[in-house]
Amino acid sequence: MKTKQQLRFLATILLTTILFVLAKTDTDPLEVLALQDLYKSLRNPEQLRGWRLEGGDPCGEAWLGISCSGSSIVDLQLRELKLLGSLGNQLQHLHNLKILDVSFNNLEGEIPFGLPPNATHINMAYNNLTQSIPFSLPLMTSLQSLNLSHNSLSGPLGNVFSGLQIKEMDLSFNNLTGDLPSSFGTLMNLTSLYLQNNRLTGSVIYLADLPLADLNIEDNQFSGIIPSHFQSIPHLWIWGNKFHVEPNYKPWKFPLDVRPLIQNDTGYPTTESSAIMNFPRPETQKVKKKKKGIGAGSTFLLVGGLALLGTFFALFAVRMNHRRAQNLAAIHRSNNSIAYSLPVSTGREYPVATEDNPQIKRFQPPPAPQLRHLPSPPVRIDKSARRKSFSATCQYPSFAKLFSAAELQLATNCFSEENLLGEGPLGSVYRAKLPDGQFAVVRNIPMSSLSLHEEEQFTEVLQTASKLRHPNIVTLLGFCIENGEHLLVYEYVGHLSLYNAMHDEVYKPLSWGLRLRIAIGVARALDYLHSSFCPPIAHSDLKATNILLDEELTPRIADCGLASLRPLTSNSVKLRASEIAIQNTGYIAPEHGQPGSSGTKSDTYALGVLLLELLTGRKAFDSSRPRGEQLLVKWASTRLHDRRSLEQMIDGGIAGTFSSRVASQYADIISLCTQAEKEFRPPVSEIVEALTALIQKQNKEASSSVADKTDPFSKSFCSTRTRFISSPTFSYLSS
């Protein structure tokens, strides 16, 4: 009897211990799914010991490269593992991750838009990542260090740095172009910035007031004046640019007694040719000595001898440089997967252990390889060579899938009426079910008989549209060009448009918090189109019906990058488009019809109309109203700056849920966007900043306002994890 009791006691202890261990080690299911998606995107590499495509417990089973705190993954170190593939699209579910290091691999594709929202250190250096910095970066308010150096990032830097507390950022050795965005000027904690070896242009004035201790902007195309504040930066590299220096420019007093801790310079340039044009070299010493006179003949012989000697050394230097370049190029060709350059990250360790996460270890940036990377020469495509046969030589988009006409006929049930979602200015839109079970949307664009040049133009539009990747833009999945058919395949977001949600009684009222979230999402998408491409992409048809709301009520703009296809459509489609344009008169800017009118400034105007629509609950154009009230902007423009009139024009469903100060600031933003003269409308990047400031003010008021307790979206803004939290799906149905 006593033995049985002892056995029961031991069994109880054993069971309790097992349950305790399981409770301690079971990893968050969302984080497990994120790692499984990453493993699949990395092509199931054998070197990731312990990783699985299904099941498993990363924390309990000690998957390679993973460190946990309890059941949360806090550290993901996959450095120098010769990994291939991409980073997937589920990293945003790693909510507790602090450190992400995937440097020194062979990763390809773009940087995911969804990054770990609470990460403090991200290192993706020495890979083959393309595109540019994702527009979700401002959501990472805890980020302290970002290293994206030695990749293939290209295009302009988006205006994506607002609200960050980052201290160290390295974007060097890429192919970034364009001017520095204004949001650089908001990085008031930034102490180390490395931008060398890109093709950045314009002024560096946004860096003037930053507390920088390390700044390297060498080998770019920066121009304009050099901020005087730069001479107080202890470690500074600015050579190889096009700065303008006046003839009477006062020489700087560089801190020569401080040696660089990092980077690839060992001192000041040894020749004037490597410094910026006309920029004074620092004088280390000034020594004056009396010299004896030299006769004219001696002077002639001396000058001639020096000239001959200089010519000899110049020829020798050219020969040696040519041979050195050939050797380095050969090394680069034979080791294409390795980036030969000196480190651009600091040589210091990052202290990232915190009270909340004591198990996080320090990580140190990679050591320096010994050779310097030589960029490959640009490849030029001779367009005349592909005019011989469009179908045989056309280069289709590499970011989208090529579907056959038979596949899409099967997916849409031969484009049946039951799958017809609607008619737009570019043709009919159908719902489709792809062979893998995924739902999609197929847009059938009837074209007139296209010339070879017009077919090439269509393909160029596809190339651009297929590259668009933004959380507030509907993604192009694929296309079909076959037997005269031109079909585009988009992801299926849902069939709820902002227009339906705003103006159909079954969906009203949308909460004020949700309306703000929609406004900032649409503005960010437009900013992405305008700031991340050269030339900028204008939507040219922004309206409530073109903004879809997904299951989480996140706004997604449709038909981005397709504006230039309208002249290529058939006459019947053009007629239908003109009828639709009459219905959308309220979004059309005053300069419409003038040369160059369909640009980014027209998008700014349409954004202002949308903001006004969200505030008032009225349609942009409503023929059922009295003549003086049909055009929303015309009716509201005189009321926006009168406090009593402004209060009266606010939608009754949200009246009283926010302060008059917030309403007044929102009205100011609308007024800026809807200026009659396009020159006075600000760029959308400034509208994003203004809306962000407005939401921050709303947050402060919501925390102490009783009225806002009825608005779950306003409360969601107060989260410390991310600036915007996905909204509950029931709120827009609230009665």
Swiss-Prot record:
Q: Where is the Protein kinase domain?
A: 415-695
Q: Which family does it belong to?
A: Belongs to the protein kinase superfamily. Ser/Thr protein kinase family.
User: Which PANTHER family does the entry link to?
Assistant: LEUCINE-RICH REPEAT RECEPTOR-LIKE PROTEIN KINASE PXC1, LOW QUALITY PROTEIN: PROTEIN STRUBBELIG-RECEPTOR FAMILY 2
Please give the organism: Arabidopsis thaliana
User: What parts of the sequence cross the membrane?
Assistant: 298-318
The protein's name: Protein STRUBBELIG-RECEPTOR FAMILY 2
Q: What is known of its domains?
A: The protein kinase domain is predicted to be catalytically inactive.
Give the knockout phenotype.
No visible phenotype.
